[in-house]
Amino acid sequence: SSTDANRKNFAKTAITFMKDWGFDGIDVDWEYPADATQASNMVLLLKEVRSQLDAYAAQYAPGYHFLLTIAAPAGKDNYSKLRLADLGQVLDYINLMAYDYAGSFSPLTGHDANLFANPSNPNATPFNTDSAVKDYIKGGVPANKIVLGMPIYGRSFQNTAGIGQTYNGVGGGGGGSTGSWEAGIWDYKALPKAGATIQYDSVAKGYYSYNAGTKELISFDTPDMINTKVAYLKSLGLGGSMFWEASADKKGADSLIGTSHRALGGLDTTQNLLSYPQLT
C-alpha cells in the first residue's frame, strides 16, 4: 500500500476476485497498521478500492452500492494508530473484532470478550469492548457504522484456580484437553464441557465455565451474553452484530447467531447483486 501503483493494483485485483465469485463487496483485514505512515497508507488504499468499486458499479451495475468494510482491532495499542475519522468516512462498516482479549498469549486467565472492565478484578479484564467502542465513536466513526463482533468459540486455560489468576497451559502437548481447531480454542457447540459449571461476571459482563476437578476454565459467550451485547449495541445505535464464525454455532434456541437475529429483529435484507457481466 506504500505506492499509488500498488494501491491501484490491489484494488483492481480485489474487484476482479469479487466479481468472479459474485460477492457484494470487499472486506479488508489488515492486522494491523504499525505506525502513522501505514495508517495513512491504509486510508489511501481504502479510498482507491472505494473509487474502483464505484467505477465498476457505474459501468456494470448502475445504482448498486458495493460494500467496503474492514475488520478492526479492539485493542487500544492497535486502534490508537488508526485514522478513525477518515475510516469512518470511506467505509460502510467497521467490523470490530471484540474478542481474543485473553488467551495463550496472556500472563493470567481472563475474559475472551467481556463488555466492561472489572475494577475489582482487573487481571481478568485487560481489555474491554465498551472502551473500544467509545474510543471509535469519539475518534470520529459514526456509531451506526460500527458492527460489534462476537466469538462463537471459547478460550481455555488449564491448571487455574479461577478468572484473573495464574494458569499452566491451554491444552495440547499431551495434556488430554486440546481444542476444536487449535490448542486452547473450543467451538461453542462443544461447550460447556462435561463436569464444568457456568459462571457469570456481572461487572465485566462475561461468562466462563470452570471445572473444579480438572481446574480448566473456558471463557465463552452464551445466548444470555449475546442478548446483553445486542441490548448494549442497540443502546448506542451501533450497526449490528457479526460473528466469528458460523460453523462453530449450535442449532436451535442455543444458537448465538439465532439469538442475535431474534434480539435485533432480523437480518440485513439488502439485495444481492446477481449480474456480473464481466465474469471471467
Model-identified regions with their sequence ranges:
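Short, acidic/polar
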Residues: 2-20, 76-87, 129-133, 220-234
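Active-site proximal loops enriched in glycine and acidic residues that flank catalytic Cys/His/Asp
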Residues: 150, 242-247
